[in-house]
Amino acid sequence: MLSPKRTKFRKPHRGHLRGKATRGNKIVFGDFALQAQEPCWITSRQIEAGRRVLTRYVRRGGKLWIRIFPDKAVTMRPAGTRMGSGKGAPDYWVAVVHPGKILYEMQGVSETIARQAMRIAAYKMPVKTKFLTKTV
């Protein structure tokens, strides 16, 4: 699973998921992409599940780029803990995704294979997605 090697702060604020993605919303590396249509937090486990689906489906044929990285720690308190006594310990990592953000890019396979692979990977995502092709 993906996680940062080190961060400036252990326990970040939750923040708001307002607005659309202004960066990372265009196809840069590959020819096909999976784009988020809704705001959400995507966990490192979900990113890894999508990556496994895509790599297994395209075999050795294609190249894959993951365009998001889980750099925000989500804290959890133990079950049955009373209120107070501070914030919980970091439990898992999430990538903050705004609408329009590219999640995965792919190259080196036909459009039908890429579309099918991205469709299967989209089932692993907690958000509505859209398949994009690079326009010249």
From Swiss-Prot:
One Pfam match: Ribosomal_L16
Keywords: Chloroplast, Plastid, Ribonucleoprotein, Ribosomal protein
Family annotation (CDD domains): Ribosomal_L16_L10e (cd01433)
Subcellular location: Plastid, Chloroplast
Listed transmembrane segments: none
GO terms of biological process kind: mitochondrial translation
Molecular-function GO terms, alphabetical: rRNA binding; structural constituent of ribosome
Cross-referenced Gene3D superfamilies: Ribosomal protein L10e/L16
GO annotation, cellular component aspect: chloroplast; mitochondrial large ribosomal subunit
Keyword Secreted set for record: no
Coiled-coil spans in chain: none
Subunit-level organization: Part of the 50S ribosomal subunit.
Family affiliation: Belongs to the universal ribosomal protein uL16 family.
Name this polypeptide is given: Large ribosomal subunit protein uL16c
